[in-house]
Regions:
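Long, histidine/aromatic-enriched segments associated with O2/redox biology
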Residues: 1-233
Length: 233
């Protein structure tokens, strides 16, 4: 719809088709799953207060206020080797249970995580290099949180790397400031995330999303009004 509505003003630069669960196949607000079968997006802002603190820009130039920064990454997922793992190995890599999405120290998807829990042998229940543990914000940097909106993709095998599948994710996240939120998270993941064994980042971009229209106060009577006026358009 947006492409058709803007055909006289803009052209498509790049397109990646993606999909998530069909509408009505899950309860409203349920966390979607990625192509590894994992719930993806459990730790997302939920309340208006969370969105105000993590997503909507409230500092900087006036034209950016109320908007958000969007990071897009194409991530190829090696499903061929992932499917050779047993269930416990998959859950250890992510730090969560496959069926419920609960942390390995809990029973429900949204249970609090206990990173200090150990098993009968004194080993951590949640591996310190699991995806969940590495992505979690440090105690001294609670601002390192983002809104995830990933989409799955499945294309015909291209034969370039010998995989039987060409499957992955269009990872999209929103935040106030990528340099203070997304980038430090991704730096930790690059360094030690166990999931790196099965993930290859093949594309990356960053965008600014203007705020929606706010006809009531006249500031944004049409989309991107403040941005266009600032740019002299």
């Amino acid at each position: 719809h947006m492409v058709r509505a803007g055909e006289h003003y803009a052209s498509v630069k790049w397109l990646q088709q993606g999909f998530i669960n069909a509408y009505g196949s899950q309860e409203k607000g349920a966390t979607a799953r990625n192509m590894f079968g994992q719930k993806d997006g459990t730790v997302n802002p939920r309340s208006e207060e969370d969105f105000a603190a993590q997503v909507w820009i409230d500092k900087g130039p006036q034209w950016a206020n109320g908007g958000t920064a969007m990071v897009v990454r194409r991530i190829r997922m090696n499903v061929d080797t992932w499917e050779k793992l047993d269930r416990s190995s998959r859950e250890n890599a992510i730090g969560r249970k496959l069926d419920t999405g609960a942390p390995l120290t809990g029973e429900d998807e949204f249970d609090a995580v206990d990173f200090d829990a150990v098993d009968d042998y004194g080993l951590p229940v949640i591996d310190k290099n699991s995806h969940m543990a590495v992505a979690a914000p440090p105690a001294d940097h609670p601002e390192q949180r983002i809104l995830r909106r990933p989409y799955n993709y499945e294309l015909a095998p291209d034969g370039k790397d010998g995989q039987l599948s060409n499957i992955g994710q269009v990872f999209i996240c929103y935040q106030q400031d990528p340099t203070q939120q997304f980038e430090p998270i991704q730096a930790r993941l690059d360094e030690s995330d166990l999931m790196n064994e099965w993930l290859t980042h093949i594309g990356s971009a960053m965008y600014f999303c203007p705020p929606g229209t706010l006809a009531a106060d006249g500031r944004e009577s049409w989309w991107a009004k403040s941005l266009c006026e600032h740019a002299g358009l």
